[in-house]
Amino acid sequence: MDEFDRDLDNELEFSHKSTKGVKVHRTFESMRLKPELLKGIYAYGFEAPSAIQSRAIMQIISGRDTIAQAQSGTGKTATFSIGMLEVLDSKSKECQALVLSPTRELATQIQNVIKHLGDYMNIQTYACIGGKNVGTDIKRLQQGQQIVSGTPGRVLDVIKRRNLSTRHIKMLILDEADELFTKGFKEQIYEIYKHLPPGVQVVVVSATLTHEVLEMTGKFTTDPVKILVKREEVSLSGIKQYYIQCEKEDWKFDTLCDLYDNLTITQAVIFCNTKIKVNWLTDQMRKQNFTVVAMHGDMKQEERDAIMNDFRSGNSRVLISTDVWARGIDVQQISLVINYDLPLDKENYIHRIGRSGRFGRKGTAINLLTKSDTIELKALEKYYSTKIKEMPSNVNDVM
């Protein structure tokens, strides 16, 4: 694992709105964590806490409700995972912590991070997600899982079936909270929360936190410590952003083909707004003998898992996807993101291009525009207080 870009990481501005004097822990040793957890942290590849980790981990361990926002790729998942692992009772086989995520892939990735960090702790964790046989979930839950990472629909299902006991849950984590609180997830989360014991600790984590999300989390948090980054400073530092004017929609494909040789230098993700567009673009690229893989929400879970594993391992170099892939999926080698379509939701821009600069590395984002996209590009620049430049004629100058 690459080290954090310490200069970039230290630029993040934190505003502790509900409390003053949040202590900053510059080393993991200063947190006085369990020796076996500390061993897992170092084995995973961390050397020193990132800005969010140095502030939020101890707040979580202390039992405070915590709202944490930080740049994509600064170790938010490890932040709540370390806090959670420190306070769990490894001798009890009851479920003690519940993590909710907006996508199956993210829930599975969180499970893997927890497994690695808790490698020396004898902690059982399980990804409870849709797309899998519920019978398998029931069997695994009956074996005893101290941490469950899942999607709201499936988690609520196993709670209602009484296959997941909530009596001993002391921590609820909402990851990528802004997406979780969109229509469809909000009601399920409230329903899950009603089944949890009174006084359960709530940890809210996201790269972006809207005013609406902060309002909603206020309904089930008590005097939370807020560790926030100003919106315009989130996730864009260290990522070079460009646009290519294509005039017509039809010209985008030719432009993408011209860029293909540069896509495979490391790994690249191409985002489209619809599943139909993903399938169409994948077919067109393959007809031109370009090697690409595709992923969207209509695929079976086994197929999505296989594609993710291939992409993680580097066997496939170019992935075409909808926004199902944009949030929190951690593949270290990605250095280029192409927005074939500008995102429909401004908040998703940050999640998409944040993939290209994981853990403080430098990345490049290229936006393919038609004339009608120009207004939306200007709106993105204003929203994030950033400047998106026109792509130089020599692509090698920016890659």
Swiss-Prot record:
ATP-dependent RNA helicase involved in 40S ribosomal subunit biogenesis. Required for the processing and cleavage of 35S pre-rRNA at sites A0, A1, and A2, leading to mature 18S rRNA. A motif (DEAD box) lies at residues 175-178. It catalyses: ATP + H2O = ADP + phosphate + H(+). It is found in: Nucleus, Nucleolus. One of its GO terms (biological process) is maturation of SSU-rRNA from tricistronic rRNA transcript (SSU-rRNA, 5.8S rRNA, LSU-rRNA). CDD domains: SF2_C_DEAD. It is an enzyme of class 3 (hydrolase). The Q motif is unique to and characteristic of the DEAD box family of RNA helicases and controls ATP binding and hydrolysis. PROSITE patterns: DEAD_ATP_HELICASE, HELICASE_ATP_BIND_1, HELICASE_CTER, Q_MOTIF. It comes from Lodderomyces elongisporus (strain ATCC 11503 / CBS 2605 / JCM 1781 / NBRC 1676 / NRRL YB-4239). This is ATP-dependent RNA helicase FAL1. Pfam families: DEAD (PF00270), Helicase_C (PF00271). ATP binds at A70, Q71, S72, G73, T74, G75, K76, T77. Residues 238-399 form the Helicase C-terminal domain.
